[in-house]
Regions:
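Hydrophobic/aromatic-lined pockets within catalytic cores
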Residues: 29, 33-37, 107, 118, ...
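Short, charged/polar, low-complexity loop and linker segments
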Residues: 2-9
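Generic structural signal of hydrophobic/aromatic residues within well-ordered alpha-helices
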Residues: 28, 85, 99, 146-149
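Gly/Pro-rich turn-and-neighbor structural signature
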Residues: 9-86
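Compact, glycine/acidic-enriched structural inserts
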Residues: 123-149
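Intrinsically disordered, low-complexity regions
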Residues: 1-2, 55
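Internal mixed beta-strand/loop scaffold within catalytic domains of large alpha/beta enzymes
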Residues: 54-129
Length: 149
């Protein structure tokens, strides 16, 4: 009985995570469009038997190019890599869903920005991710603000 509940809960968590990343993608795209005035184009992609995702791209007046991408993938880790990943001791399978945002500005005074987060399930589950800014023209005040945030 507990295995059935656990499996159901795991599948529900996957569904919730996918929907949350989709909603987060829509929020990012809406805000970028509001700032820029341009519109995103969307393209889906699939990887045979291992999942897929949607790429959203905007080229505009404020942003040279923005990509807001979501994906859900599954598969099996190769044996040599499996040892480095938590939760793969009993089974080498993984499932992951996430979002990645990359924004390059028209102005060299505004840093490029990257953000990603993902939900990963092996025999364990966790969220991972990060963010970074890459300035074309270094502004120490911006650097300090970013690192304090």
């Amino acid at each position: 009985m507990s295995e059935t509940i656990s499996k159901h809960d795991t599948e529900n968590e996957k569904k919730i995570a996918q929907e949350w990343f989709r909603e987060l993608r829509d929020q990012f795209c809406n805000k970028f469009e509001e700032i820029d005035g341009g519109k995103f184009t969307r393209k889906t992609w699939k990887h045979s038997g291992e999942g897929g995702g949607e790429m959203s791209t905007l080229k505009g007046a404020v942003f040279e190019k923005v990509g807001v991408n979501i994906s859900t993938v599954k598969g099996e880790f190769k044996e040599d890599f499996r040892k480095q990943i938590s939760g793969t001791e009993e089974a080498p399978n993984y499932w992951a869903s996430g979002i990645s945002v990359v924004a390059h500005m028209q102005s060299p005074f505004v840093p490029a920005f990257h953000f990603n987060t993902r939900f990963i399930q092996t025999g364990q589950k966790w969220f991972g991710g990060g963010a970074d800014m890459t300035p074309s023209i270094l502004n120490e005040e911006d650097v300090n603000f970013f690192h304090k945030s």
